[in-house]
Amino acid sequence: MKIIIAILIFSVLILFHELGHFLLAKACGVGVTEFALGMGPILVSWGKGETKYAIKALPFGGSCSMVGEDEDDPAPNAFGNKKAWQRFLVIVAGPVFNFLLAFICSLFFIGFGGVNKPVVYSVGEAASAGIQRGDIVRSINGKKITLGREIPLYLFSHPLDGSAEIVVERGGELLTKTVNTHREGWRMGISYMADESGCTLSQISAQSAAESAGLKAGDILVSIDGTKISTGKQLSEYFTAHPLDGSLIELVVKRGGEELSFRFLPSHYETEDLGFSAEYYYDDAAHLGFFGLVRYSAKEVVYWIRYTLMSLRMLISGQVGMKDLSGPVGIVDTIGQAVETGVENGGAGAAALNVLMLMILLNANLGLMNLLPIPALDGGRLLFILIEMVTRKRVPQKFEGLVHLIGFVLLMILMVFVLFNDVLRLFGK
């Protein structure tokens, strides 16, 4: 099922991209010889005027083949014989149409799923600075915030350093608060899940005090320092009354029917955070009105463009490695996970919203990548047209073709590498 959904998503993405090229080519008088969805052998084709329309066997890809696109052609409707601004519009239309599709998907995503307003829904240490539940975050250190998800994106590229100036809206009034962001304390390095069977350790953090002591995921908590623990409430109450202070602690757990005792020192930590949460609050879009819906939909697209730019910056700076890149196989797996998670948490409607969010991300990603000056992609061709428009001298077509050929070969090598990564990642699961 996830493969079918992924094929449909890829098909819509590429069809819209190529449709942009197609419509602007027709508008600028460029002859289109073939407009196809997919690659490889033709399954179905039909003709209308000068254009052959086709559906091909492989669902990944698509094409809008124009007269004189890659070679000299004396025909007046050849792509190469059109003015530079006309060629620019034809090429840039593909990425622009991806942004347009991302915007359309955002309208549905926000209309049915709600708007991700930066409303404070949980307050920790920031309460001492006057931050309250229900406050709407308007800016952090002067950076305007419109969506809740913009907060972690901002913090990733602007690390906190002791304090932060937060502007919040409360009852229609803007208030400026300065919060202390430095946190330090003690932790064991465990996560737990509480159910009928008790408090089960669900995760042990790598290189944590708990891991060094020998605790394992799946252990069932019996007691802490002699106090019996059988529910999540009891555990929370215990740490409220006895916060970790670096002293020796004893945990008794049940593993395989046997009770085991572990004594260890919690580890000290220092970190920075805002002391409140406002990232994942969703408000009903019904009160937004038409222009509000359009505004927030545009912000959603801008958010994913910025997210893609940040990911590229991380790749270039070495914060993430080439092994973290994903291709079609990895995207299919991600789509499958999004559908499964949605069905488990909220049924078909939640799954559809997850798919819509992925559509927004993928369209923003495809649109942006095709605007970058990468040979063989739209951005590379746009660069040569811009050079021509500035210098008023056209770059020799043979030289441009050679540059695009080299770029295409390098992209194919990258695709093979990414495919190999995807397969290794899948088998690694």
What role is predicted for each listed range?
Residues 28-29, 33, 113-132, 429:
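Alpha-helical transmembrane signal-anchor/signal-peptide segments
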Residues 86-122, 152-157, 162-205, 250-252, ...:
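PDZ/PDZ-like peptide-tail recognition elements
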Residues 10-14, 65, 98, 102, ...:
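Alpha-helical transmembrane segments of multi-pass membrane proteins
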Residues 402-422:
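Final/C-terminal transmembrane alpha-helix of multipass membrane proteins
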Residues 27, 51, 58-122, 413:
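Internal alpha-helical transmembrane segments
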Residues 2-75, 369-391:
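Small-residue-rich helix-interface/hinge motifs
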Residues 81-82, 187-208, 212, 220, ...:
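Functional transmembrane alpha-helices
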Residues 128-148, 210-233, 301:
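Conserved PDZ fold ligand-binding element
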